[in-house]
């Protein structure tokens, strides 16, 4: 092992093996090797929307081979522009159809569909940072749920680029491009909030 004499030679980025050793009281994600502290406990609105969506999604996939998971659930993403095993996220909801991606630690690879429910403190991270991560890692579909304005954005991966559908608002039905039989009324997503 050689001596490090210059700050530029230090590797301050972390990997999944480091992540597994942490015992923080707060939840964190690892984004391209850098630690990102997550928001404290989600709001009641966030949790209600999460339960509503999870119920609808889980009911649809109950008789399918795909698996549905809710946070906290580690997803290790393959990011081409970062070191291997340097990105671990905890999406609000994710659907994984390839059993080979699942292990005892969570998901190792891009889920088929990820849902993020916006919170005031996480909206920039979910709309910007995670959008780019999910697109780069090959998540086929990404839903962003806006709880204050009550709409859902659906992005589908086409030629490695997310293409957005028009926002789905109350009175409309969310339709997945990758699971066309799954149709969820937006009013059901925001029930009881």
Segments predicted by a language model, with ranges:
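Gly/Pro/Ser/Thr-rich low-complexity, intrinsically disordered segments predominantly at protein N-termini
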Residues: 1-193
């Amino acid at each position: 092992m050689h001596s490090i004499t210059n700050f530029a030679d230090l590797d301050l980025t972390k990997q999944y093996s480091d992540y597994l050793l942490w015992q923080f009281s707060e939840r964190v994600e690892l984004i391209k090797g850098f630690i990102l502290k997550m928001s404290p406990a989600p709001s009641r609105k966030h949790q209600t929307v999460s339960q509503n969506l999870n119920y609808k999604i889980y009911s649809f996939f109950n008789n399918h081979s795909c698996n549905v998971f809710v946070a906290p659930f580690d997803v290790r993403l393959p990011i081409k522009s970062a070191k291997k095993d340097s990105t671990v996220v905890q999406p609000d909801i994710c659907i994984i159809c390839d059993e080979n991606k699942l292990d005892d630690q969570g998901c190792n690879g891009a889920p088929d569909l990820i849902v993020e429910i916006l919170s005031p403190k996480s909206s920039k991270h979910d709309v910007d940072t995670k959008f780019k991560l999910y697109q780069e890692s090959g998540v086929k579909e990404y839903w962003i749920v806006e709880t204050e304005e009550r709409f859902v954005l659906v992005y589908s991966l086409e030629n490695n680029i997310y293409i957005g559908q028009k926002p789905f608002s109350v009175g409309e039905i969310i339709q997945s491009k990758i699971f066309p039989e799954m149709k969820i009324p937006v009013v059901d997503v925001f029930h009881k909030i």
